[in-house]
Amino acid sequence: MAEHIVKIISTDDLTHDVKRFRVEKPSGYTFVPGQATDLSVNTPELKNKKRPFTFTGLNSDPYLEFIIKIYPSHNGVTKELDSLKPGDELIVRDVWGAITYQGKGVFIAGGAGITPFISIFRDLESRDEIDGNMLIFANKTEADIIQPEEFRKMLGDNFINILSEEKLSKYPHGMISEEFLRSTVGNFNRKFYLCGPPPMMNALKGQLASLGVGKEALTVEF
């Protein structure tokens, strides 16, 4: 597996626990929107401590972008990433990933599971092909929603949020249920893209099966 040492160009806080990293792009390095790579911090102690992260930018960008949820309590790679600054080095490796765009459909994300969809939607918008897609984004609170303004601008009324902990009049409250899907999605004769925590994904697969969605219509990544 090829390894590329790249310098961090910039870091930005997007939410209380999510950061955007832009790093140098190796010559000739390409990916399909929705794909990921294994990243590590380029220090002797951490270079072999790899974790998967999804590309959130576009191939046309002069940098690679990653939007990463930080888990300080896990004492792992994201905690180390949180302390890095421009000029520090990461190692990026070959691309991989199960989620790629297969045609218009409904995208359902839980928390940091939104990241593969960011690149997909940005790519669709750049090609003026975003119409006909819907995004349902499940989070605990409004403060957890990643890139809400960007998704609202791209998708309008087809960007739907649901909050499981915080109750606000402008958002549905609770967990995604079969009833919620029935009232929100309407037409189930289309593709579904799912990414989020395994318990959520398992529940969604069961709910969608009950609503008549076949396995062939599902693209899933945990």
Question: Which residues are covered by each model-predicted region?
Answer:
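FNR/FR-type flavoprotein reductase catalytic core
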Residues: 73-222
